[in-house]
Regions:
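Conserved helicase NTPase motor core
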Residues: 135-235, 253, 363
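Conserved helicase C-terminal RecA-like lobe
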Residues: 313-317, 352, 360-427, 431-436
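Active-site beta-strand-loop-beta-strand hairpin of nuclease catalytic cores
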Residues: 1-15
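Short, amphipathic alpha-helical "recognition" segments used to contact nucleic acids or chromatin
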Residues: 458-474
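A basic/glycine-biased coupling hinge at the interface between accessory DNA-binding modules
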Residues: 12, 16-39, 44-51, 57-162
Length: 502
């Protein structure tokens, strides 16, 4: 039997690993890069020492060659018979059915389809933007994944003679434009913080007339959590720019919760200066609502939740809240679950506790709230998935504050409780939001920094510009801001370029 080893190395054409290699492991980029490349060197040396056959591919092959053909050629030269898997088999391998990775991927695709329709853009228009920006990653994803799905979705709606909610808004707008709409004296809009471009266009058509009907809108920009469904916070925060002379009445009394949660939550949400400033105070100053952070070790996670639930009086209501619908995954191994219609419960001790996503909990309340998995992770809180750079081309640009949407969502989560909110986090990987409350001294600009050019390929002109700034004596921080990349990326690239010149 002939034994052959096939290794895929996750490095680009310059031998550099992706930035998330460091983020997911809680180490610096330099450490992640060095550690991974040391592993590559060791593996190659080991195969050479023991005269074993090693075939290799790298991430660079996906960009500069046909990885499938390269792999096929390598295997054929090594006299390996090839039995290719079907597309369905490959999909199940990459995204196992019902796994959190498959759910996150589906959510990303659905989000793009929703946004492309609500923003009134075409896929071709978005592709032109990605190509003009030199964003190869986003161009590839949109062209090869999102566009075919979007096309098939539109075809399926036509085949079954149905429309979705966005279609209903768009068609209603067209009907109003082409006919003589009813004249209104007043138009009242609730949850106005969630208004999107398509709904704004519909509202604008409804108000056509001389004089236009009076518009009365109610909303809370602190709870604007549907940006990924197309909502545009600028339509709320800059209301008068879109609708003319405006009178603003602030509702600054909360009837649900008291101090210290009122002050803590207000300070947290208003760190983002794009949010409207408000001075929230409780209706009853005697009401107290606590905010408590609870760390855990992974092996004790379910027990910690059980202990918290057991400590809550039996006559008090309790919510379990997750950033994702799969945040209750580990609970399912220890506690019995019960589904009642669209509601989901866990039997913990002698109690039936409802589990909800934070989005579903908006507008609801309980005496006690336990927020799960507030960890520094791709699927943590704040979520890193929802901010995938590919969505920047269809998202509104009204709020550029780092994790602005996630911050509002976290605010919604912690303010569902009337008595106490518990925030659970892995003691090894507390999220940046947890650190902001417990260890504000650890928070720096880099903690929240986003880098618009992080996914762009380094070009010769970019390299020359980098070297020019560096030799002019500019600081690494200045260069990083100027080039839209992280300071770590700049340091690594300089090391690569300076090494070539020696």
């Amino acid at each position: 039997t002939k034994r052959i080893y096939l290794e895929h190395f996750g490095v680009d054409e310059h031998g550099l690993v992706p930035i998330w290699f460091a983020k997911d492991r809680g180490i610096t980029y330099e450490e992640a890069n060095q550690k991974y490349n040391d592993g590559i060197t060791w593996k190659k040396a080991a195969h050479e020492k023991f005269s074993t056959k090693l075939l290799t591919t790298s991430s660079a092959d996906f960009h500069y060659s046909d990885i499938r053909e390269k792999l096929k050629t390598l295997l054929e030269k090594a006299d390996v018979s090839i039995q290719e898997k079907t597309d369905a088999e490959l999909y199940d391998m990459v995204l196992p059915p019902n796994s959190k990775h498959e759910k996150a991927f589906i959510r990303l695709v659905v989000t793009f389809v929703t946004l492309i329709k609500s923003s009134c853009k075409s896929v071709d228009e978005v592709l032109r933007q990605t190509k003009n920006a030199g964003d190869e990653r986003s161009t590839f994803i949109i062209k090869n994944i999102f566009q075919p799905v979007y096309k098939r979705y539109i075809e399926e709606l036509a085949n079954i003679n149905q429309i979705d909610f966005t279609d209903a808004i768009l068609q209603a707008t067209d009907i109003c434009r082409s006919s003589h709409p009813v004249k209104y004296d007043y138009i009242i809009v609730d949850e106005f913080q969630d208004i999107s471009v398509d709904r704004y266009n519909f509202l604008k058509v409804l108000r056509e007339g001389n004089p236009p009907p009076k518009l009365y809108c109610v909303g809370d920009d602190w709870q604007s959590i549907y940006r990924f469904s197309g909502s545009d916070m600028a339509l709320f925060n800059q209301f008068s720019d879109y609708f003319g002379q405006t009178e603003i009445n602030k509702i600054e009394t909360t009837y649900r919760f008291g101090e210290p949660l009122v002050s803590l939550s207000s300070q947290f949400i208003q760190r983002n200066e794009a949010q409207i400033k408000k001075n929230i105070h409780p209706f009853n100053p005697q009401v107290k609502t606590e905010l408590q952070f609870c760390d855990y070790e992974r092996r004790d996670y379910c027990n910690v939740i059980g202990q918290l639930v057991a400590s809550i009086p039996l006559d008090k209501s309790v919510f379990l809240l997750g950033r994702y619908s799969f945040d209750d995954y580990y609970l399912s191994f220890m506690y019995k679950s019960v589904k009642e219609g669209n509601r989901f419960f866990y039997i913990i001790g002698d109690r039936k506790i409802e589990f909800l996503t934070v989005h579903k909990s908006k507008g609801l309340e309980a005496d006690y709230v336990i927020i799960l998995q507030c960890n520094k992770d791709t699927y943590g809180f704040p979520s890193l998935v929802s901010d995938d750079p590919v969505l920047n081309y269809v998202l509104t640009k009204s709020d550029q504050y780092p994790y602005g949407e996630e911050r509002r969502l976290f605010y919604v989560a912690i303010t569902r409780a009337k008595v106490k909110t518990y925030i659970l986090y892995d003691r090894r990987f507390p999220s940046v939001f947890v650190d902001e409350f417990l260890h504000p001294e650890k928070i720096t600009e880099e903690s929240y920094a986003k880098h618009p050019n992080a996914n762009k390929k380094w070009t010769r002109s970019a390299d020359n510009f980098l070297l020019t700034l560096y030799h002019e004596g500019k600081s690494i921080k200045y260069i990083a801001e100027k080039m839209g990349r992280s300071q770590t990326s700049i340091v690594m690239r300089l090391g690569k370029l300076e090494g070539k010149r020696q």
